[in-house]
Amino acid sequence: MRHYEIVFIVHPDQSEQVPAMIERYKGIVTARGGVIHRVEDWGRRQMAYMIQKLAKAHYVCLNIECDGETLAEIETGFKFNDAVLRHLTVKMKKAETAPSPMMKAVQKEDAAKSHRAEAPAA
């Protein structure tokens, strides 16, 4: 089995369905004997360019270990799901389990927001 990193972008109006989508794709991988190494929900972020007249979208990253048939099934699911705007699959040399640089940035932004919310207004 090979290691893959999959990033997919979900329509911002469908953000509440993202946890269910993640569970569905995780279920496909595990049902076929694959392994989930990392799941990251990067949240709603600004896109580099407009897609379908949208400036923001919900980003999700999965690091998995599976065979080609499982990967094909996941990618077919992306193609027939109207909520998925784009997806990218990259073959990796080894399993990635540490937080990605993007996730570290998301955590840093969340920490800054919570710090600002706790600070009293002057």
UniProtKB/Swiss-Prot annotation:
Positions with biased composition (Basic and acidic residues): 106-122
Cellular compartments per GO CC: cytosolic small ribosomal subunit
Region (Disordered): 97-122
Domain of life: Bacteria
Entry's Gene Ontology molecular function annotations: small ribosomal subunit rRNA binding; structural constituent of ribosome
Classification via NCBIfam families: S6 (TIGR00166)
Function, in words: Binds together with bS18 to 16S ribosomal RNA.
Name used for this protein in its record: Small ribosomal subunit protein bS6
Lineage of origin: Bacteria, Pseudomonadati, Pseudomonadota, Betaproteobacteria, Burkholderiales
Gene of this entry: rpsF
